[in-house]
Amino acid sequence: MYDEHYTRLNQYRSLWILVFFDLPTETRKERKIASEFRKKLLDDGFSMFQFSIYIRFCASRENAEVHTKRIRNSLPEHGKIGVMQITDKQFGMMELFYGKKPVETDKPSQQLELF
């Protein structure tokens, strides 16, 4: 019973960060800037969900704020970028489809955080 209670609370305390962006890519320089922004997201542990949507699991709100701050510090000069945090419970309720075929959502892997 304790494990069920802890897991339930954890689903509401752990978060997913979603980063949505639309960056200009008309010139070679703009494409390079957009590519560098994507690389920074990947280097910070984000995974590509769709081409301009990246996601990352965070064990706590404090951890999510650290990663959100890193995004703020690496914003390109032009383009539109949105950052949203949702609970693990909300993320688990997402319905995914490839065409008309439903797809199960991935469970976050166990992560070890060292300070």
From Swiss-Prot:
Its cofactor is Mg(2+). The keyword Nuclease applies. Pfam families: CRISPR_Cas2 (PF09827). Mg(2+) binds at D22. One of its GO terms (molecular function) is metal ion binding. Its EC number is 3.1.-.-. Keywords: Antiviral defense, Endonuclease, Hydrolase, Magnesium, Metal-binding, Nuclease. GO terms for biological process: defense response to virus; maintenance of CRISPR repeat elements. InterPro entries: CRISPR_associated_Cas2 (IPR021127), Virulence_VapD/CRISPR_Cas2 (IPR019199). Belongs to the CRISPR-associated endoribonuclease Cas2 protein family. CRISPR (clustered regularly interspaced short palindromic repeat), is an adaptive immune system that provides protection against mobile genetic elements (viruses, transposable elements and conjugative plasmids). CRISPR clusters contain sequences complementary to antecedent mobile elements and target invading nucleic acids. CRISPR clusters are transcribed and processed into CRISPR RNA (crRNA). Functions as a ssRNA-specific endoribonuclease. Involved in the integration of spacer DNA into the CRISPR cassette. Homodimer, forms a heterotetramer with a Cas1 homodimer. This is CRISPR-associated endoribonuclease Cas2. The gene is cas2.
